């Protein structure tokens, strides 16, 4: 499995582009959203091709992306904050992103819709089964006829597209984007939510429902830190402890499962070895 470390920096870069297109250049917001998604798609495609065609390590590719996108966002704005003009209103866009219906934020509905689509894609489609197979063992998946290069590239494209959508929501929520800090450590939040939701860092295991619950649990942990009066500066320490605990639990679970499989296999062999053999029939008895 691979981890995309460029998520936070990509949110900053795409957020700056979106805010400037809508607020500075007057581009209609549906067009701006489409452009941001296209840019995100191209960035994800670049990640996938570098990993599959040039055989670069996902960690190296996405780490370089983290640095490049953050630097590009800061260079584009000249370290200035990108924001919407004072008093500017975008009723339809604001209703879609930060509005509420029946007291429920529309971002929650967006999360549910995206979660359902991703659940179907991962658990009820051929691509999802191929993705899990590649995550467990890329070589075995390749030998079984799966187009591993396509699957890996598609995974990074999907990740980048979802990051582009998140960039729009975050930009509308904050109303401004500070390129040096916007989206900082968001990739760690994503990793922590996935680990809490039962995803294996080894790849090939996990569920969409689990990662949604993991994201909810992570937010509740942050709220608990605030309620307990723990300084907000320790949020990252709590997050690191959560990730560490999740990794340790994942390793222990994998060891337990391996021992259980070995015990079952040994039991099957023992039963076969102890099966009664049919006594040979004497020729005289047949006569």
Residue ranges, per PLM feature:
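Helix-loop-helix "hairpin" substructures at the membrane interface of multi-pass membrane proteins
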Residues: 27-36, 41-47, 51, 100-178, ...
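Cytosolic-side transmembrane-helix boundaries in multi-pass membrane proteins
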Residues: 143-150, 221-287
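Hydrophobic alpha-helical transmembrane segments
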Residues: 9-13, 30-38, 60-63, 108-113, ...
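Single transmembrane alpha-helix segments in multi-pass membrane proteins
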Residues: 1-25, 49-56, 191-194, 198-208, ...
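Transmembrane helix-bundle core of multi-pass membrane transporters
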Residues: 58-124, 151-154, 173-182, 259-286
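Interfacial loop-to-helix junctions that mark the boundaries of transmembrane helices
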Residues: 25-31, 96-108, 178-185, 227-237
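Transmembrane alpha-helical segments in multi-pass inner-membrane proteins
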Residues: 163, 174-239
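Hydrophobic core segments of alpha-helical transmembrane domains in multi-pass membrane transport
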Residues: 66, 70-71, 110-121, 156-167, ...
């Amino acid at each position: 499995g691979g981890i995309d470390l460029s998520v936070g920096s990509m949110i900053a870069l795409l957020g700056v582009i979106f805010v400037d297109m809508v607020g500075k250049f007057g581009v209609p917001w549906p067009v701006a959203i489409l452009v941001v998604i296209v840019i995100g798609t191209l960035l994800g495609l670049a990640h996938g091709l570098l990993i599959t065609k040039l055989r670069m390590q996902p960690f190296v590719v996405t780490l370089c992306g983290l640095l490049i996108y953050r630097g590009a966002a800061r260079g584009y704005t000249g370290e200035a904050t990108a924001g919407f003009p004072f008093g500017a209103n975008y009723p339809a866009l604001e209703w879609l992103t930060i509005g509420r219906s029946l007291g429920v934020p529309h971002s929650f509905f967006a999360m549910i819709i995206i979660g359902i689509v991703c659940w179907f894609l991962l658990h009820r489609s051929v691509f999802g089964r191929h993705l899990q197979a590649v995550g467990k063992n890329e070589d075995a998946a390749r030998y079984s006829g799966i187009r591993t290069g396509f699957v890996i590239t598609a995974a990074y494209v999907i990740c980048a597209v979802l990051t582009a959508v998140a960039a729009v929501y975050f930009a509308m929520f904050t109303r401004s984007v500070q390129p040096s800090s916007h989206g900082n450590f968001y990739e760690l939040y994503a990793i922590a939510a996935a680990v809490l939701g039962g995803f294996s860092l080894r790849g090939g295991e996990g569920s969409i429902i689990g990662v949604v619950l993991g994201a909810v649990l992570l937010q509740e942990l942050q709220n608990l830190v605030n309620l307990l009066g723990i300084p907000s500066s320790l949020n990252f320490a709590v997050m690191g402890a959560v990730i560490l605990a999740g990794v340790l639990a994942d390793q222990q679970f994998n060891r337990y499962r391996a021992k259980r499989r070995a015990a079952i296999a040994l039991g099957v062999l023992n039963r076969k070895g102890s099966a009664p053999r049919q006594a040979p029939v004497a020729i005289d008895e047949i006569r």
